[in-house]
C-alpha cells in the first residue's frame, strides 16, 4: 500500500471540493482515509493514505480523460 492521488483508469485524479467525498472514495477503494488536497499539483484532488497497490494512483503523463 502507498499514499497518493487516487486516479481512474485514464490516469485522471478525482476532482474534489470537500474532504468527506475523498475520505469515502478512498475508503471504498481500501485506503485508511483520504482528504481533498486543495491547489495541489493536479488542482483540487483526492489524496488517499495507505491505498492498496492494486488501485491506480496518478502517475507522470497525461490525464487521458
From Swiss-Prot:
Alpha toxins bind voltage-independently at site-3 of sodium channels (Nav) and inhibit the inactivation of the activated channels, thereby blocking neuronal transmission. InterPro entries: LCN-type_CS_alpha_beta_dom, Scorpion_toxin-like, Scorpion_toxin-like_sf, Scorpion_toxinL, Scorpion_toxinL/defensin. Has the structural arrangement of an alpha-helix connected to antiparallel beta-sheets by disulfide bonds (CS-alpha/beta). The keyword DNA-binding does not apply. It comes from the Eukaryota. One of its GO terms (cellular component) is extracellular region. Expressed by the venom gland. Signal peptide: none annotated. The modification Arginine amide is found at residue 64. This is Sodium channel neurotoxin MeuNaTxalpha-9. Its main location: secreted. It holds the Pfam family Toxin_3. It is found in: Secreted. Residues 2-64 form the LCN-type CS-alpha/beta domain. It comes from Mesobuthus eupeus (Lesser Asian scorpion).
